[in-house]
Curated annotation (Swiss-Prot):
Protein name: Methionyl-tRNA formyltransferase
Cysteines joined through disulfide linkages: none
CDD domains for this protein: FMT_core_Met-tRNA-FMT_N, Met_tRNA_FMT_C
MF annotations from Gene Ontology: methionyl-tRNA formyltransferase activity
An annotated GO cellular component: cytosol
Binding site for (6S)-5,6,7,8-tetrahydrofolate: 109-112
Keywords: Protein biosynthesis, Transferase
Length: 312
């Protein structure tokens, strides 16, 4: 049976691991170290570690794999293939070149578009109507290896980064399992990435999280769903942070300055730069838990003045 080392960390990686383990001999799982989580800073294992332990697969958690003692241990396993999915570290050539069939990665974009750590976020932020998964060879350069297979999936207005992570995770696992038989048999010719079409999906900055109400409504709508459920887009209300977790978009145009409020007892609408409307459905005022808009409008939202504007 084909011996595989699997490397991954977040929930996205779990379906890939479980599918692999159902058919192949996964001899080791490499993931990030346990990290403190939440206000109480409880030391918490990555989702992949939990899944690996349930499957009785040995787990390695080096802080920096490149300089760790675990690196030589992994090479000594003499695996046939290395598979990664959102592991979180660039791997040294000594490991990439050690397996018989090399090292491949499950990446959540249609490469060469969106190399990097936040491809799902950027597909939504940019208003894409489709994205997908690419399986490619791993090289030391970030997400630059030749492409082995690729599969597309639509993005709807109802999707956000959370829903697309779930869909792409399952799609990636399916594509990998469909690809491996021919790949291991040497029947697939990998395709180089077109360097002229390369774009990058770098980690989201704090500045990207802040809503600029002078921008068009569709752009703001894409920002809100692209940053939901993490790290979450925010604005200010009476100079205090105000997060918008979920919202809908209305193309109906209204007069009013960007950030102006149109409200009744149960709904809140915000005017954008082109006059179209953002309609928040799940929000989080400063110092409060997140809540649906009806709860907000029946409480603190009742006191909103018609002259109040978001972003001031």
């Amino acid at each position: 049976m084909t011996k595989i080392i699997f490397m991954g960390t977040p929930e996205f990686s779990v379906p890939v691991l479980t599918q692999l383990a159902s058919t192949y001999d996964v001899v080791a799982v490499v993931t990030q170290p346990d990290r403190p989580v939440g206000r109480k800073r409880v030391l918490t294992p990555p989702p992949v570690k939990k899944a690996a332990l349930e499957l009785a697969i040995p787990v390695y958690q080096p802080e920096k794999l490149r300089t760790s003692s675990e690196l030589e241990e992994l090479i000594a396993l003499e695996a046939d293939l290395l598979v990664t999915a959102a592991y979180g570290q660039i791997l040294p050539n000594s490991l990439l070149e050690s397996p018989k069939h090399g090292a491949i990665n499950v990446h959540a974009s249609l490469l060469p578009e969106y190399r990097g750590g936040a491809p799902v976020h950027y597909a939504l932020l940019d208003g894409k109507t489709e994205t997908g998964v690419t399986i490619m060879y791993m090289v030391e350069k970030l997400d630059a290896g030749d492409m082995i297979s690729q599969r597309k999936i639509p993005i709807t207005d109802e999707d956000n980064t959370g829903t697309m992570f779930d869909k792409l995770s399952k799609l990636g696992a399916e594509l990998l399992m469909d690809t491996l038989p021919d790949f291991l048999a040497g029947k697939i010719t990998a395709i180089p990435q077109d360097p002229e079409k390369v774009t990058f999906a770098r980690n989201i900055s704090r500045e990207q999280e802040k809503i600029d109400w002078t921008k068009p409504g569709r752009t703001i709508f894409n920002q809100i769903r692209g940053l939901s459920p993490w790290p979450v887009a925010y604005t200010t209300l009476e100079e205090k942070p105000f997060k918008i977790w979920e919202a809908t978009y209305e193309e109906t145009k209204e007069s009013g300055e960007p950030g102006a409020i149109l409200a009744d007892k149960t709904t809140l609408k915000i005017v954008t730069g082109d006059g179209t409307l953002i309609v928040p459905t799940v929000i989080q005022p400063a110092g409060k838990p997140k809540m649906d808009i009806h709860s907000f409008m029946s409480g603190a939202g009742r006191n909103l003045s018609k002259t109040t504007r978001f972003g001031e």
